Amino acid sequence: MASAPSDIPENAFRLAKASGRCQSMMSQMKDETKCMGAVFSGYPTALWLEYEVSPQPMSGTLKERLKKARASSQPFCSVVKRIKVENEENDQTLSEPGESSKEENCSKAQESLENKDNEPEKESSEDKNTSESKSLDTGSSSVLQKDSTEKTIKQTLKEEKAKLTRQVQEKEDLLRRLKLVKMYRIKNDVTELEDLIKKWRRCGQRLLCELQSIMSEDEDEKLTLTELIDYYGIDDKLLHYNRTEEEFTGV
């Protein structure tokens, strides 16, 4: 019984040749060989032995059996074909989400590439903005530094100018005095000048002594010469006054 399905196609070909239907059945049997194995698996082996032993024209019963077998085999093959078509449709439906996912992945990859391409441009624009802001900051700081340095330089120049003007005035005064002394020495004799100075010193000393006597009589207290000199703001060296002894020297 297990070897009968494998011998079915050969017996069917022999029977078709004997009946004169070889050309019409060849095209159908090529597609239905697989189905026929399942259909003819239920027939007894004696029937197939009868086909092999007697290569005679088929009887009516055999023809009817063949027709029944062909009729029963057609829907089975149609079921198989339908299953194949459904499987192909399922494969297509399964493949379509995969393709859509692939398309989504491709679109995501393209977007990521575009974002990566745009990132350097953004970074370059940000770098440009930062460099421009830094250059502006450095420029403003340099301008402020220049202004501060210029102000300090101007201030120092003003101070030096005022100092120089004071020194010039002092030198001019000293020069004027020296010129006066020279002029007096040219016009007058030095000995005469010394005599005049001595006379003026003696007059000053006498005047202070008289003031001391007058003021002490009014106040009933004797005033010292140092108090009178300090009161009038007279230089001790000009009058040759000695504070320790409270006397005039060289009188």
UniProtKB/Swiss-Prot annotation:
Q: Where in the cell is it found?
A: Nucleus
Q: Some GO term, biological process aspect, for this entry: which one?
A: double-strand break repair via homologous recombination
The protein's matches in InterPro entries, at most eight in alphabetical order, are given as: SFR1, SFR1/Mei5
Which keywords annotate this record? Answer: Coiled coil, DNA damage, DNA repair, Nucleus, Phosphoprotein, Transcription, Transcription regulation
Q: Residues bearing Phosphoserine? A: S27, S72
- Gene Ontology cellular component list: nucleus; Swi5-Sfr1 complex
Q: Where is this region: Disordered?
A: 88-150
Using the record for this protein, list the coiled-coil segments as residue ranges, or answer none: 149-202
Q: Which residues constitute the signal peptide according to the record?
A: none
Bias (Polar residues) ranges: 136-146
Give any GO molecular function from the UniProt entry. Answer: transcription coactivator activity
Q: Bias regions of kind Basic and acidic residues — which residues?
A: 99-135
Where's it mainly located?
Answer: nucleus
Report the PANTHER family cross-referenced here.
SWI5-DEPENDENT RECOMBINATION DNA REPAIR PROTEIN 1 HOMOLOG
How does it associate, per the subunit comment? Component of the SWI5-SFR1 complex. Interacts with RAD51; the interaction is weak. Interacts with ESR1 in a ligand-independent and ligand-dependent manner.
Q: Report the family membership.
A: Belongs to the SFR1/MEI5 family.
| Role this protein plays | Component of the SWI5-SFR1 complex, a complex required for double-strand break repair via homologous recombination. Acts as a transcriptional modulator for ESR1.
Task: Spell out the protein name for this chain.
Answer: Swi5-dependent recombination DNA repair protein 1 homolog
